[in-house]
Swiss-Prot record:
Biased composition (Low complexity): 49-72
CDD domains: AAA (cd00009), RecA-like_ClpB_Hsp104-like (cd19499)
Protein name, UniProt field: ATP-dependent Clp protease ATP-binding subunit ClpL
A Gene Ontology biological process term: cellular response to heat
Known function: Required for the development of induced thermotolerance.
Natural source organism: Staphylococcus aureus (strain N315)
Keyword Nucleotide-binding: yes
Annotated Gene Ontology cellular component terms: cytoplasm
Region of interest called II, as start-end residue ranges on this chain: 383-575
Pfam families, sorted: AAA, AAA_2, AAA_lid_9, ClpB_D2-small
Length: 701
């Protein structure tokens, strides 16, 4: 080929390039680098000679270490069990497990399933907090003590975390390889029993999708479980067992269910007594028997959404930790560190022949040692029932107090406190007070709400105000009142506002603003159904269950407890009854609006009477007290004459409308006029209110 590219010029360039390359290969032109640093040929030769004697030995050691690592990864199945699990039986031998009390029946059933020849795989099914894991630990202790069938007397229970099997499996087949090593490890040991907590996670665990061909953990374990080659203990909740395990019939038949129920209050007290020593040693706090019983009783009453014994143990642990933090105990670590520093200083002083200084240091060391020894016993805090009440109050926000003399007097005087705020409605106040006293003293049946009442009567007589005052007096906060205006619940879809929508409807996953969710978050509340006669009949049907059984099931199937609430319904039905109306007249009026089974659920139906002028005298004093509270923020005092009060009552009295017109008059004639006077006299410190020429006047000082 002859073209313009392959010409004589190109040939000369090529020959010159080849000559340069040959020159670079000469010894004098070679360059050597070690770890990125240029070295001379002489230095390279010296380093090579020094390393030649050790190279063979190092290579042999490196090969041996690599072989050991490979054997540990592939063939060391016994070590693999130790890497991914905890040997509960060994921990029981070492005394590291807490004692298990009152679970002999469940432990015996689990041991019987394990001793079977095939399908020897028990699964503990129970709600969260009832002690499923503790039963497995109790079984490990029973194996150590020899209180199990002969077939499992040599078994070792290995607790395996499923996530540890998935960790680091970034390549196809790595997860399956881990499972095979686990199975081979169990086979080779011949006495290992695997314990999977939250065993429902094995469904789909490790699978990467139906199209990839990757198998999940449950699919790999099924053949080995069926043949009895491995034995597994599982633990899960009722919901997870139903939603995951039972859907896989092949997996379900390989397990034998052991039902774990919540222990009784008596058994829970015994459980706390069994673990008391561990908590006392950990927190350095004494825990008497009455404290243990209070943990159980108060947790049952005030933490209904959780189960025993978990909630009682948590209350005990939190109380002991709080007392330990508050106790002026000696910091053991800091004291021992200080003693060590002084020992060094003493040795230096002796070396320097400063014997007087060394003697002083020795005295300080002895003082610290005595202080450390005394701190182990003399300064140990002792828990009381009041401490348990404080813990419950911190957890729930409810002002829990021990039933002492002061609290008994407070319960006795609850009607007087309410009567001072609710004027002219003594019958309603007394009925509500009796229900509260009965509940707080512990003499009600405990299943129904604290009280359920129907307040009927004209507008403006204190029905809603009584509900507000109850929330403040019982729960210390007016925000504990859940008020529902029944005019918003009159349509056919109103039920979804109460319990949330059911599956298949929009908003199923968002029930945050429903009544059931509000009660779940704040179980100690006063629930006010205002103007109940306007509600849809389906709402009244729901209330039948609440007032009778004390619970309600929301749209997602959760059972909400209402037994710590007070239910108050208000109605204007019976408005025409006068002060002398009998109870049968009230019931006759109520039957026009409500079904008999609804009325029969209430603890009491109370008619609120019309307010007379004598009652308004007390009401106007309360309204003026509210005005004074506002003036206190400005540093202003107020004095209202009796003539001014009488004038306000005359102007604001309306028998049909109750106290609301009086409130409006106080707003217009007192608050507004004080505001106008203050804007003209910003330095005022005192105001007098009186009547002149049939008008209210404000004078300041």
């Amino acid at each position: 080929m002859n073209n313009g590219f392959f010409n004589s010029d190109f040939d000369s360039i090529f020959r010159r390039m080849m000559q340069d390359m040959q020159g670079s290969n000469q010894v004098g032109n070679k360059k050597y680098y070690i770890n990125g640093k240029e070295v001379s040929p002489e230095e390279l030769a010296q380093l090579t000679q020094q390393g030649s004697n050790q190279s063979a030995e190092q290579s042999a050691q490196a090969f041996q270490q690599a072989a050991q690592r490979q054997q540990g990864q592939q063939g060391g199945n016994g070590n693999y069990l130790e890497q991914i699990g905890r040997n509960l039986t060994q921990e029981a031998r070492d005394g590291l497990l807490d004692p298990v009390i009152g679970r002999d029946k469940e432990i015996q059933e689990t041991a019987e399933v394990l001793s079977r020849r095939t399908k020897n795989n028990p699964i503990l099914v129970g709600e969260a907090g009832v002690g499923k894991t503790a039963i497995v630990e109790g079984l490990a202790q029973a194996i150590v003590e020899g209180n199990v069938p002969a077939a499992i007397k040599d078994k070792e229970i290995i607790s395996v975390d499923i996530s540890s099997l998935e960790a680091g499996t970034q390549y196809r087949g790595a997860f399956e390889e881990n499972i095979q090593k686990l199975i081979e490890g169990v086979k080779s040991s011949q006495n290992a029993v695997l314990f999977f907590d939250e065993i429902h996670q094995i469904i789909g665990s490790g699978a990467t999708g139906s199209d990839s061909g990757s198998k999940g953990l449950s699919d790999i374990l099924k053949p080995a479980l069926s043949r009895g080659e491995i034995s597994i203990i599982g633990a899960t909740t009722q919901d997870e067992y139903r939603n995951n395990i039972l859907k896989d019939a092949a997996l379900t038949r390989r397990f034998n269910e052991v039902l774990v129920n919540e222990p009784s209050a008596k058994d829970t007290v015994e459980i706390l007594k069994g673990i008391r020593e561990k908590f006392e040693e950990h927190h350095q706090v004494k825990l008497p028997d009455d404290v243990l019983k209070a943990c159980v009783d108060l947790s049952i009453q005030y933490i209904p959404q959780r189960l025993l014994p978990d909630k009682a143990i948590d209350v005990l642990d939190i109380t002991a930790a709080h007392l330990s933090a508050q106790s002026p105990a000696v910091d053991k670590v800091e004291t021992e560190k200080r003693i060590s520093e002084l020992e060094n200083d003493k040795r230096k002083a002796v070396s320097a022949e400063e014997y007087k200084k060394a003697d002083d240091i020795q005295n300080e060391i002895k003082s610290l040692q005595d202080k450390l020894e005394n701190s182990n016993g003399e300064h140990t805090a002792v828990a009381t029932v009041h401490d348990i009440s404080d813990t419950i109050q911190r957890l729930t926000g409810i002002p829990v107090s021990q039933m002492d003399d002061n609290d008994i007097e407070r319960l006795k005087n609850i009607s007087n406190r309410l009567r001072s705020k609710i004027i002219g409605q003594d019958q309603a106040v007394e009925m509500v007070s009796r229900a509260i006293r009965r509940n707080r003293a512990g003499f009600d049946d405990g299943n129904r709400p604290i009280g359920s009442f129907l307040f009927v009567g004209p507008t403006g007589v204190g029905k809603t105000e009584l509900a507000k005052q109850l929330a403040i007096d019982l729960f210390g906060n007016k925000d504990a009142l859940i008020r529902l205006d029944m005019s918003e619940y009159s349509d056919t879809t109103a039920v979804s506002k109460m319990i949330g929508t059911t599956a298949g409807y929009v908003g199923y996953d968002d029930n945050s603003n429903t009544l059931t969710e509000k009660v779940r978050r704040n179980p100690y509340s006063v629930i006010l159904f205002d103007e109940i006669e306007k509600a849809n009949p389906q709402i009244l049907t729901l209330l039948l269950q609440v007032m009778d059984d004390g619970n309600l099931t929301d749209g997602q199937g959760n059972v909400i407890n209402f037994k710590n609430t007070i239910i108050i319904c208000t109605s204007n039905a019976g408005f025409g009854n006068g002060n002398d109306a009998e109870e049968k007249d009230i019931m006759h009026e109520m039957k026009k609006f409500f079904r008999p089974e609804f009325l029969n659920r209430f603890n009491g139906i109370v008619e609120f009477l019309h307010l007379d002028k004598d009652a308004l005298q007390d009401i106007v004093n309360l309204l003026l007290d509210d005005v004074q509270v506002t003036l206190d923020k400005k540093g202003i005092t107020m004095d209202v004459s009796q003539d001014a009060k009488d004038w306000l009552i005359e102007e604001g009295y309306d028998e049909e409308l109750g106290a609301r017109p009086l409130r409006r008059i106080v707003e217009q004639q007192v608050r507004d006029k004080i505001t106008d006077y203050y804007l003209d006299h910003t330095d005022v410190k005192h105001v007098d209110i009186d009547v002149e020429d049939n008008e209210l006047v404000v004078k300041g000082k």
